[in-house]
Amino acid sequence: MSRSQSPSLNDGLSTSNSRHSSSHSRFSLHKAFPQLSGNASFNGTSPKTKLPSRFSGGSNPPYMDSLKEQESSSSSSRSNFRRANYVNPGRIRSSGLKYSLQAPKELSSIDKINDPASRSIVISGKNHLGLYRFREDYGKLELTLDLFNIDQKAASLRTTTRKTSTISDVKAGFHNYKNYVAICGTSTSVSIYDINRANLVDGPASMVLSKHTRSINSVDFNMAQTSLLISGSQDGCIKVWDLRSSQGRKNKSDLTINSGSDSVRDVKWMPTYDFPNNDDVVAGPSNRSHRFASIHDSGLLLTYDLRQPSQAEKRINAHSGPGLCLSWHPTLDYIMTGGRDGKCCLWNMGSKPLNPASFQNIHHNSSFSTSAASSFTQGFSANSVTNFINSPEAVVNTAHPLTKLKFRPSAIPEVFDSVIALSSLGENSDVSLYSLSRSYIPKNVLTTNSPSCGFVWWNENLIFNIDKQNMVTGWDLGKEPTVLDNLPKNKIAWRDIEGDGLVFLAQDKGGYESGGPDGMSVSTETRNFSQSRLSTTTMSNLFPSHTMRQNSSVSSFPALNTHSNSGANLGDRPSLPRTVTSYSKGAYTQTYGSYNTHSSHHNSAASASASSIATELGSEHVLSPRMISLDLPHILNSIRSAKIENYAKKPSRPGSAAFKDSPVEVFKFLSRELKFSYMHDRNFNKPENLTDQDDLAQSVDDNDLKSHLITRFGFSENNTWTKFIKKSNSPEKDAAVENGTKVNEASIEKVTNSPNDTGSDELSSISKLSTEPKKSDLAERNITAIRQRVKHFIELVSMCDHNAEIYLYIDDLSNFKIWMMMRDSLLWELKQITDSLETDGGSLLSESLLVNPDVTRHSNGARKQSMASDYSSFSTSEVGSTTGVQALPEFRGPHSLSTPPRATTSFGAKEPSSLKKRESTIDENLSETEIEAKGLPKEDIKNLRNQISKHQIGDEVAIEDEEEDKFEEKSSAGTDASNKNIPIIPSERKVSFVDQFINSMRSPKTLHGDFETDGSRMANSASTKRSSQPSFSSSLAGLITRRLSDQSPKTKPKDLIYSKSSGSIAKNSSDLFDFQNVEGNNSPRVLTQKSKISMLLKGLKKSETAPPWDASRLIKKIFEQSVATGNVLLTISIILLFQTTFKVTSTTVVKNALSEFINILHKYELFEIAANLLKFCPWDDILEAGNGQCTVRIYCERCKKLLVNESSKEKFTEEWKRTGRQEVMKRFGYWYCDNCSKRNTLCVLCEQPLKKLTFCVLNCGHEGHPECFKKWFMNEEMSECPSGCSGFLL
């Protein structure tokens, strides 16, 4: 059928590119969306962060006879006024809006009347079918005819009245049927209206075609054979009606195609446009008027030929969800489909592949897929031309269901120069126009009052739209600004993926055509980035290659490069955020190792990887946008190295230079090597059938590790916790070790039977009580608790040491020192536990001492040698330590000073009972509250107070003489004690910074028995402000005890006073000294003075703060510093290692931090580390976060139905409840089907059901158990499939 040709309107329209200066972009993401009332004046709005709304239904490509008309050059003042009122909230004036009208009723669908002279559009809605006429000279749009509400007089003469349902689609006919309008809706019929018969008595209704059994979704007229009408319904049937035949009058379709139970969402005839000057356009197929396409709820795209309707011409799984709309290309053999999965896919329906030249100038964004020519969808091979239909030529990911999309009606020789208009379900009110040559940025965005219900192209420059607020708008695209015009020309931002540098955009903005004047030229696009340093990720973005992008974590490790090209493509549906639209050309999925970070101002971040066909044919011509990045850490390090010559000459560790310059590689290296959880190597439950020999074999490695730590850190083998570690698996050896950790009962009996001890009866009763089982059980529980705590601290120490070595390997000294500080603080904490066992430890390790801890004072015990061990033997640090410092045998640690000293004199156990009574009386003088609590008479209280006030210290010489006597007494006592047990002083021990902190208030000279001078004592007493604070009670007590035992005639009482805050302590101490001096008893005086001072400090210890090297305090401070500085790895390490021990922060912070860290690991493709982190997480609720995030549906291989097996599940559950045997549930599973009572695929080797993990041979698809395949392929070294087919192991 011949058609007249009309010139294009390109020359008649003038393009306005004027812009108003504004600091805001039209597409600002921070602008609110104002709801506008429906009136004649229309104000546009800017797009929001949410994406456009979409509705179901399709539309036929408009008829192009309207191109015959010329656009009038004149316009009225009213239209100019209306255009002038259109102002975006971004303050950029738009001149594209030409028509606007508020419709009187609800609107749902729109189409054009294909009569050039009418200049009308038809709009349908609920109880509304109106004909709207627009006038270009006045810019006016008005309702001229409502086919449902015509002359009432004529309507009263009708014999019948037809009721219409909610209209879902409306279409207008062509040529001889150009006055026909077809509507369909929720009813089962298609109604045909003749607009030329509106004023007749019979009315405009011409016929009703009601052969469908369910609601009809789409109708369409054939452009060539204009009498043919096609309809698609929810009943899964496609019906073709010939309006000329008598079948339509009989309510019968001429052709019915049943697609099964799959509902038809949209159906379209292939268009047959006749464009002017169409000689250069590739001629379409000869059967264009016979072809039509349909898209279904299953996502299936079908094409048919009327001459062979019994079989589909093409079958394409276009979408993973329901397909909602489709549109044929005006001239080429392509179809664009949209679905609920948010994808807009371009499919080549021809019989030959694309021309390679068509890919040469495609504007390509590879910020999503870093290897621009490496994306192949599953099942597609570029080597086989016949399989190219399995992959879409282009994919626009909108993240919202697409319900309306239409090609721009124009003669385009290149498919990627085509423009498509689309709208989607959602709250965003706009119609987006994309050019496939630059689909990551929309060409135009037509903002409306509310979400769009439908649109139609009048010609290539005029588009009409209807929205939910019943507003009809018309847009002149020649005068509408493009998105590129409103985007900022200069942009700088931090790199999202690495966060270590800046990103600049090239100033050449490009255009929307592949070969236009604004398009990028391949010959001139030479990229030289030698002036700026680019990371491996940026280089792979800028220079696409045929090889798949290597995982960035592998690039720095040559040993892993052999696996870099073996990655497979990811799944079909990448997770997309709600506010991001991504575009991928020629790739249905993202490439392995790619990432999504790009975001445009229109929220349509476009990603594109090269077409799968272009990969083989012309990928070297595919270009990506230029992105220049600066690696700031590298630049700063270079500047620093230039200024510090020695730093540049510093030798680096072998292997660290390969990745230490890349922050991303350093992060990945640390994430792999650092230890985050002490539960990683633990076994949750020991098998019941594990024998003692197996247990012994399993514990060998642990014992060796702990023994290695004991040797490495210089721990004494006489400590209690080392005995716990070296506990043997033999019952005899265990008994021996336990006996060694308890106080020797023989020594207790010896003390008990001493003739000089007046309290022998009391100790005898204690010895009897120690045999009671109740006390023995309590001691065992205490020992077990201490053993577990010691073991836990050893694990933490080893992990801190490991993490410190990792940071030292990459020359990160700051973090290395931090981990060493935490390690040494844990060693100090470990020493406190051992000291408590050695001093107060008798009460934990001996049943007798559980009753009376003071018995320690009267016994030498079997642990005297370990009590004499020095602090440096516990916490020697290899880094930052000093040499040449000897250990102090008499030093017992801070906690030991809070209890009465033990075994310091040879006559400590021979203390007369009278002295004990007087000692208890002096104790009552410490606190009036304590005195009253003990119930002493007030007269005794008064006498004691008088004695204390009467004998105040008034002369320093008296104290010097007193201390000389004390030194003589102690020296004699030390001589007697040395005859019994001579401590061995370790030589050349190293001490850590914790030793230096604790021992800073005593001179190293005392380690060799030298005497201090007055000046040295004064310097030590006032060395630091921290050393003078009462919070360090243990160190203060240690200094007081040591000085009281020193042989120094020059010691003054003011040495005991450290600050004003501790004046009361010193005063009480001096009172005690003077009272004992008056009594004149020198022998017990030394012990009594030391005891009272220790008791005084012990009472104040609860209200004092911990020392700065306390593990809990130090780790919390480091955690706060790491959070403030943004040290992610250190923060997460502290949380996972120390949260359960020291309660570093709140549980909410822990959960949020771990969630964000897991997201970061996923972003850097460290999935295995993230899985291990969840697996060994000590919190169950966080562990559950990695489960239940996906649902796998399994279908029966026989009946093709979903495997639910509810009946068998109920059956086995009832049997379990009835019998109480839980193993009954093992018979339940999804390896069989309740519907057909058949089993699924059996193992190809053992022919047993596949109940759990299953392996599959990719070549042939045969499945089997992992054990069977391992035995077949690995043990027996077979390469063929066990079934004997042609499959083989790659």
Curated annotation (Swiss-Prot):
Chain positions covered by the region annotation Disordered: 1-87, 732-774, 856-924, 960-984, 1004-1034
One CC-aspect GO term: vacuolar membrane
Record key words, sorted: Metal-binding, Repeat, Vacuole, WD repeat, Zinc, Zinc-finger
Zn finger (RING-type) location: 1243-1285
SUPFAM superfamilies per record: WD40 repeat-like
Alphabetized PANTHER family for the sequence: GATOR COMPLEX PROTEIN WDR24 (PTHR46200:SF1)
Similarity comment: Belongs to the WD repeat RTC1 family.
Protein name: Restriction of telomere capping protein 1
Organism field: Lachancea thermotolerans (strain ATCC 56472 / CBS 6340 / NRRL Y-8284)
